Regions:
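RNase H-like, Mg2+-dependent phosphodiesterase core
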Residues: 1-319
Length: 319
């Protein structure tokens, strides 16, 4: 057997709300790579909404989510996937506990998360999700594939600002946190080939030094470095590890599901954030947190923020 891991992020650019980095880990037959996994599971998983039919869609979150389209397809894919791991979330907090439990410990420091909860899923009928999980389970079993993990790293504003300062740039921080998350899943695996596919981090083409920092026991070999993809390999013959950083990596199923997990948790975080401020500032319009609108929102809440003595450090991401 071999292992496929994919990572992707959501919330890299906003000033409000957390950065989400997610990874998914799969066990596959030796001859199935990241590019082939969609085809291998095509009877139960679709890569686009266009021809999905009754199948579960797993794709770049930007292709299946928009404010108008809603959370339905994110929830269908995530609930079916989490069902393979023994999770059946019924509330907002259940979702965090299943995918990013460490985030729950940080939430009491931010008033918009204190005591917040809501039913989940919010865009799907629960009755339709159990059959999806069962269908996915049967499809994975027939293909000799197992989903082993869906894990997210949540970087809230205060930690985000600190890590950017420590690393010297937002891009370097993203790369290091992504590789740390990937390593946390890889290090527990038994012998077997491990292929990791990561969406490229902005304009970065060179990741060798960062991989050497994270996997310091091994000599990292550079196989390709360019604008479209960068490939590295290391480790002993019985546990060879490959990292491929590439543009449009969501065409690989493990990355697509990671993209969906990151986007969904980001939307859940902003749901609580907006609910808090809208309850306290009359006529306030919600925000997605991106720079231009974030400045409008920040000005609109300034008086209430001051009255509530909420420090900018837990609210505003500097970059």
């Amino acid at each position: 057997m071999a292992y496929l891991l994919g990572t992707d992020e959501a919330g890299y650019g906003p000033n409000f709300g957390p950065l989400l980095i997610s990874a998914t880990l799969w066990e596959t037959p030796d001859d199935v790579g990241g590019e082939e996994l969609f085809g291998h599971l095509g009877h139960v998983i679709a890569s686009t909404l266009h021809d999905a039919g009754s199948r579960i869609v797993m794709a770049d979150s930007k292709a299946i989510y928009s404010p108008d389209r809603g959370l339905k397809h994110l929830e269908r894919g995530l609930w079916a996937s989490l069902g393979q791991l023994g999770h059946r979330p019924k509330t907002w907090r259940d979702v965090w506990a299943a995918v990013a439990p460490e985030a729950l410990a940080a939430m009491p420091n931010m008033p918009w998360y204190v005591d917040y909860d809501a039913p989940a899923p919010s865009a799907c009928n629960v009755a339709e999700l159990d059959p999806l999980a069962e269908s996915l389970q049967a499809g994975l079993a027939a293909a000799g594939v197992r989903l082993l993990a869906v894990r997210s790293r949540v970087v809230f504003a205060e930690e985000f600002n600190r890590l950017v300062e420590q690393n010297g740039s937002k891009g370097l921080m993203l790369s290091r946190e992504t590789l740390a998350l990937a390593a946390s899943l890889i290090n527990g695996l038994p012998s077997g080939k491990i292929a990791s596919v990561c969406d490229k981090h902005g304009g970065r083409n060179r990741y060798g030094q960062l991989l050497s920092e994270q996997f310091s026991d091994w000599l990292v070999e550079v196989y390709d470095e360019g604008s479209q993809r960068s490939v590295y390999r290391f480790g002993p013959p019985e546990r060879r590890i490959e990292f491929c950083f590439r543009a449009r990596a969501e065409s690989c199923l493990p990355v697509a599901l990671a993209s969906m997990a990151s986007k969904y948790l980001r939307e859940l975080a902003m749901q609580a954030f907006n609910r808090f401020w809208l309850a306290r500032v009359p006529h306030l319009q919600p925000t997605a947190g991106y720079p231009q609108d974030a400045r409008r929102f920040r000005a609109d809440i300034a008086e209430t923020q001051k009255r509530l003595r909420i420090d900018d450090g837990i609210l505003w991401r500097m970059k």
